[in-house]
């Protein structure tokens, strides 16, 4: 249970190590993370830090959230996220504080959560990597069909969880154990090795790796 950051996926690029190796990295903008609430075991039954990220017009924020943010002295924000932390980690934080990218360090492993790119309604071959049927030799109009999806009169139904056509992508996914390659404190940017879920401009959540 450690404090993390909410950010925006800027895109991918590469940087070069001292030995000339090309390292693919994803750039994450984690600027403007502000503490909106400190939750304590005495008042809330558990210890956590709530942070706000991103800007939003005041007219687009519902009144309960607007009041909650105003109480913390934070501008209208787009994302609210809560991180469970140990009670000892609450002492140095208070509402209105800005959380810096420097809570992470080069070489540290992090988990990044985002919403994967949506591909729309897709067939089972694209969605589940099924094999195509024969292109000819007796096959008619079922080249990309999934094949049998059930049995006979008993059980007389399609079992839940059967892999079939449907919405592909646009689901929350987490990539585990990405290495922090660079921490840019001046611009509040975090560069992690490899790809993270989601499209450019998508919101992501960065936490210290749970399996590190």
Curated annotation (Swiss-Prot):
Q: Which organism is it from?
A: Azoarcus sp. (strain BH72)
Checking PANTHER family in the record gives:
50S RIBOSOMAL PROTEIN L3, LARGE RIBOSOMAL SUBUNIT PROTEIN UL3C
In its record, the post-translational modification comment is: Methylated by PrmB.
Q: What is this protein called?
A: Large ribosomal subunit protein uL3
GO molecular function of the protein, one example?
rRNA binding
As stated in the Swiss-Prot or TrEMBL entry, residues carrying the post-translational modification N5-methylglutamine are 153
Q: Which InterPro entries match?
A: Ribosomal_uL3 (IPR000597), Ribosomal_uL3_bac/org-type (IPR019927), Ribosomal_uL3_CS (IPR019926), Transl_B-barrel_sf (IPR009000)
Q: Report the record's Gene Ontology biological process terms.
A: translation
